[in-house]
Structure formats: structure tokens, C-alpha cells
Design a protein with these regions (language model features):
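"A position-specific structural signal for the A-helix of alpha-solenoid helical repeats
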Residues: 80, 112-123, 161-171, 207-214, ...
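Short C-terminal boundary/hinge segments that cap the last helix of small helical domains
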Residues: 58-74
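Short alpha-helical DNA-recognition segment
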Residues: 18-37, 315-333
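DNA major-groove recognition helix of helix-turn-helix/homeodomain DNA-binding modules
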Residues: 48-63, 340
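Helix-turn-helix/homeodomain-like alpha-helical modules used for DNA recognition
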Residues: 74-127
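Flexible helix-coil transition and linker loops at the boundaries of alpha-helical arrays
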Residues: 66-67, 101-113, 127, 143-160, ...
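A short, Lys/Arg-rich alpha-helix, primarily the initiator
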Residues: 1-17, 290-314
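Helix-turn-helix repeat elements of alpha-solenoid scaffolds
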Residues: 86-100, 126-148, 175-192, 220-232, ...
Length: 340
């Protein structure tokens, strides 16, 4: 294969290292021909698609810096606003942002449709609306990128976000007459813990998996296994400094230790840790409790207009000199303001 440049070369190397075929990696999110062009650096970059491809490879995008057009940057900002309002339990405002998202020309694309539907499912669940409504939104979200979910699970080529959707479906369905099998969640949890996720991706999903597996393993059946998974989740959360799931994992760990009649002083330390986290959430007027689909991602974005302006100024160039023989000064001004 010829030497490639840019993001395509990175994706090719990562895919080859994991032993994943192109067809497996792009199923449900891109045509095979489009993905092949991406690897060959012959396709315009779709930032949201790159996010998901990297996720399916088990890799984090937190170390990538994107230079974005303003319209793409606004979508990322819109997603953040939706999640912030959900954390603040401001349902109506979150719905308004989702309605705004729906009006975007890209809203019908699978990755965007999935985000909109999963957030509507999350809001409905947190608000205590009908389980049927939650499931309706959730199934629509899943189908966007996992049209063959069972076959895709067999390959293990799913992202943390996609695995969370499958876990959430199992949890929600436990409140209906169509409860999903215990064997399904046991298999899902094993798949998740086996997958070669980077630490920053692993922490997004294994705490949720640890919480759900404790619901299906009966008392005395295999408490050692639950304890092991809970400790792995707690360690991951502490190592990455994440709050999502932390109070619930601490609560689960405390119950396990109490049943074992473990050191009372250590249990009290865990209680105080949990209390402090909940106080921080209260002080900042947010709540992560039961917010299963929150995407806690730290990203570096550069808006292309801002980058042009900053680079021009660093080079001590005027708009007039930079635009000479290229465009009018007025056109460059509009570009730098994000209006061109």
C-alpha cells in the first residue's frame, strides 16, 4: 500500500494493528467506498465520522485538535448545550436545543440522528415518561449505526457510545413486559471488558457495565466477580478523574464491602468520598445520576476563521497585504468573522 498522509494514514495503521477489516469498521456509519477514500486521504473529512471510527477502534479523540468550519463547530457546541441542560435537569431547554438541532441540514445523517434520538430517550427516561416512548427513541438511535447489532457485536467493532446504547436498552427494558435476557447483559459486559479500549474510552463504558451486571447476578452467586468489576470501574474513574457513575459505583462498592464485613474505617472513607462528590454536583447545580448516555469528552477545537485571523496577526500582516491578489479585503474580513 502506498504511503499515505494525514488522518487516513493514522486510521489505516490503527485498523491494521487491530486486525479489523474496512467493512467491519464502517458498517452502519459509512459506505465501504467512502471509507476507502478516507484512508487514502481522498475524501473530505467528516469530523463526526472520524470521531466514531476512532471510537470503534477503541481510541480516544481527546488528543486530536480539529480545525473546524463554523457550521461544524456550532453543532459540537449545540451537543454540549443539550447535555449541559440535561445535567441541570432543565428538560424544556434541552428539548429546545434538540429542536434547533433537528433543523440543521445534517440532522438526518445517521450519527446526528442517533445523537438526537438518544438524548430524547434519555430525557424521557429521566422525566419518568412512558417506557414505550423511551424505547421508541432508543431503538431508532440504535438502528442508525447498528443495523445489524448482533453481527456487529460478534466482531467487537463498536464504540463506547454504541455499547452504552445497548446497555441502556437492556436497563430500560427491565421495566417492561419484554425484559431482555440475563444472558444478554452478561455477554455484553464481558465483550466490553475484553475490548481493547484506551483508558479515556474505557472509563466511558465499564462503570455502567459494572452497575448493570450487579443487577443480574444473584446474591451469593458470584459476588467475587461483581467486586472485581466494581473495583476495576472505580479505579478507571479515579485514574481519569471522571464524576459520571462515580457516586453509584461507590455506593455499590460500599454495599459489597458491608456484606463482607470489611474494615469499617475504609467504608466510612468511601462514604465521605461519595458525599463530597454529590456536594460538588449540588454546588454546580448539575446531576449525573442516571444520565447513562452523557458523552464526557474533552476536546481541542480551532475554528478555521479564528485560526486564519490569529495566524495573520502573529505574522504581523494586515488584511490588505494578506488579501492582495487573492481576494478583496472585505472578503477576507468576512472570512475572519465567520461570515464567508
Amino acid at each position: 500500500m502506498k504511503q499515505m498522509q494525514g488522518i487516513g494514514q493514522l486510521l489505516w495503521k490503527l485498523r491494521e494493528k487491530e486486525g479489523i477489516r474496512q467493512k467491519q469498521l464502517c458498517m452502519g456509519i459509512s459506505s465501504l467506498s467512502k471509507y476507502a477514500r478516507i484512508e487514502a486521504d481522498q475524501q473530505e473529512i467528516d469530523f463526526f465520522l472520524i470521531d466514531r471510527i476512532m471510537g470503534r477502534l477503541g481510541k480516544s479523540v481527546e488528543r486530536l485538535t480539529y480545525i473546524l468550519p463554523m457550521d461544524v463547530y456550532k453543532i459540537y457546541e449545540l451537543r454540549q448545550e443539550v447535555q449541559q441542560k440535561i445535567c441541570q435537569r432543565k428538560w424544556e431547554e434541552a428539548e429546545q436545543y434538540l429542536d434547533e438541532y433537528e433543523k440543521n441540514k445534517r440532522a438526518k445523517e445517521p450519527l446526528h440522528r442517533q445523537f438526537i434520538e438518544q438524548e430524547r430517550a434519555q430525557i424521557a427516561w429521566l422525566r419518568g415518561e412512558s417506557v414505550e416512548l423511551v424505547c421508541e427513541h432508543l431503538e431508532t438511535a440504535i438502528l442508525q449505526t447498528m443495523p445489524e447489532a448482533e453481527n456487529q457485536r460478534k466482531t467487537g467493532v463498536l464504540s463506547a457510545e454504541e455499547y452504552k446504547l445497548l446497555l441502556f436498552r437492556w436497563e430500560v427494558c427491565q421495566e417492561t413486559e419484554q425484559k431482555r435476557a440475563k444472558d444478554e447483559i452478561k455477554a455484553l459486559v464481558e465483550e466490553i471488558f475484553r475490548k481493547n479500549f484506551e483508558k479515556t474510552e474505557r472509563v466511558k463504558i465499564i462503570p455502567y457495565a459494572a452497575l448493570l451486571i450487579s443487577k443480574v447476578i444473584e446474591e451469593g452467586e458470584n459476588t467475587i466477580y461483581i467486586k472485581m468489576r466494581t473495583e476495576e470501574a472505580l479505579e478507571a474513574l479515579r485514574d481519569e478523574g471522571k464524576l459520571l457513575y462515580m457516586p453509584e459505583i461507590l455506593s455499590q462498592y460500599i454495599r459489597i464491602l458491608e456484606k463482607e464485613q470489611s474494615n469499617a474505617d475504609f467504608i466510612e472513607i468511601l462514604r465521605q468520598e461519595q458525599k463530597c462528590i454529590l456536594e460538588v454536583e449540588h454546588d454546580y447545580n448539575v446531576s449525573f445520576e442516571n444520565y447513562r448516555l452523557f458523552e464526557h469528552v474533552i476536546r481541542n477545537f480551532e475554528v478555521d476563521a479564528e485560526l486564519i485571523r490569529r495566524t495573520r496577526r502573529a505574522s504581523k500582516l494586515t488584511q490588505e497585504s494578506l488579501s492582495e491578489d487573492i481576494c478583496t479585503q472585505e472578503t477576507l474580513a468576512r472570512i475572519e468573522n465567520g461570515n464567508q
